[in-house]
Amino acid sequence: MTSSRLYLRFLRRFSTATGIDSQTTAYPGAITMSKAKSKLRKVQDPDKALAIYKSVSNNSTSPLSSRYAMELTVQRLAKSQRFSDIEALIESHKNNPKIKTETFLSTLIRSYGRASMFDHAMKMFEEMDKLGTPRTVVSFNALLAACLHSDLFERVPQLFDEFPQRYNNITPDKISYGMLIKSYCDSGKPEKAMEIMRDMEVKGVEVTIIAFTTILGSLYKNGLVDEAESLWIEMVNKGCDLDNTVYNVRLMNAAKESPERVKELMEEMSSVGLKPDTVSYNYLMTAYCVKGMMSEAKKVYEGLEQPNAATFRTLIFHLCINGLYDQGLTVFKKSAIVHKIPDFKTCKHLTEGLVKNNRMEDARGVARIVKKKFPPRLVTEWKKLEEKLGLYSKGNAAAVSSSSQTREVLDQEREDDV
């Protein structure tokens, strides 16, 4: 009865928000899964995300694709703090015959975790018997993932100890252990994670490259460099299948040393048949930025075929720190065109610098783009910043809307969306 009411609420909320009948296609035109994923990554408006999700959720037969679409949609809703809508959306799926399939229900558990609604995830896990869904390590791992996404790191060891004893069909596997390791690493206890790894070896449970990489990164982040290097040697001696991700963890630490050290490791990557990726070059760029070598950092950026959000955030931030606001503005405009604008703090640095240098029109242009891209909660905070900087008032509304650089960026965005 409860799930039926939530389902009806979801349909009413969805239809009202989008102006589209719930029985019709929610997004205009035929959308391939690839196109839908692209749009979900770009869109911040939660109602638009719901519309896209309804299209792909009805047509997709891939559990992985459906999970990806669901989690992205939930994240958009969570950013706007629309938790009742998240509950209505997820609970409405209980009416789907697939609910008796453990992988399907596990997606719902994980999605609650994406919204940091762990209590709801736990409740759904406990309802599996009533729903007629088998409970194995698959759903247990989904619950652990929800716990991690909710930043409840201390709960993971508790669940790991209690649930295999409570439920006969749950036997932790290498994925379960990997999440246990991550919980200790994320709570700043890499030494405890190492103990779990040794316990896995004794029990004959495979220590995956992901688990090794998680511990390695935590050791570096906690300043345990010697221990990290020892673990790296152990990984090499054991013949672990080293990949870009684990090398990038080493590059993360090398970026604190010097650009030369980063380049040495990148050459080592190439020598073992790995091609440095965007993340790798981001660390090289960061190393230059830390040393104040902004010309070299920009060369790295300009050589990237597909800079990611971290690329733009790092470069813009350091350009601003070095007083290069004009260059920062140019990079910001590029980030907006490719839907990868940096975080609130970085945009704040840029805008404050432009105002300080009497670039009010450019500052308003940045503000216009930020308000279009950020979720409602951050837009509210941004408007407070505008008022503080003297950017926002009834008298300058026309100036904001007439910003040529803003129109240029937004027009380019529309072309990219076609």
From Swiss-Prot:
List cystine links.
Answer: none
Query: Per the record, what is one GO cellular component?
Result: mitochondrion
Q: Fetch the InterPro entries from UniProt.
A: Pentatricopeptide_rpt, TPR-like_helical_dom_sf
Q: Transit peptide residues?
A: 1-14
Its annotated compartments are: Mitochondrion
Q: Does the keyword Transit peptide apply?
A: yes
Question: Has UniProt tagged this entry with the keyword Amino-acid biosynthesis?
Answer: no
| Pfam families the record matches | PPR, PPR_2
In terms of one coarse class, where is the protein primarily found? Answer: mitochondrion
What UniProt keywords apply to this chain's record, in alphabetical order? Mitochondrion, Repeat, Transit peptide
PPR repeats sit at 101-135, 136-166, 173-207, 208-242, 243-276, 277-311, 312-342, 343-373
- Family that this chain belongs to: Belongs to the PPR family. P subfamily.
This protein is called what? Pentatricopeptide repeat-containing protein At2g18520, mitochondrial
- Name the source organism: Arabidopsis thaliana
